[in-house]
Curated annotation (Swiss-Prot):
Peptide which can recruit, activate and subsequently lyse human neutrophils, thus eliminating the main cellular defense against infection. Keywords: Cytolysis, Virulence. Belongs to the phenol-soluble modulin alpha peptides family. It holds the Pfam family PSMalpha. This is Phenol-soluble modulin alpha 3 peptide. The lineage of its organism: Bacteria, Bacillati, Bacillota, Bacilli, Bacillales. InterPro entries: PSM_alpha, PSM_alpha_peptides. It comes from the Bacteria. It comes from Staphylococcus aureus (strain MRSA252). One of its GO terms (biological process) is killing of cells of another organism. NCBIfam families: PSM_alpha_3 (NF033426). The keyword Acetylation does not apply.
Amino acid sequence: MEFVAKLFKFFKDLLGKFLGNY
């Protein structure tokens, strides 16, 4: 499902930003 893949990528990028700040 393309929607789930986009959602997963969005959360992964968001998590990467959070981890990048610390």
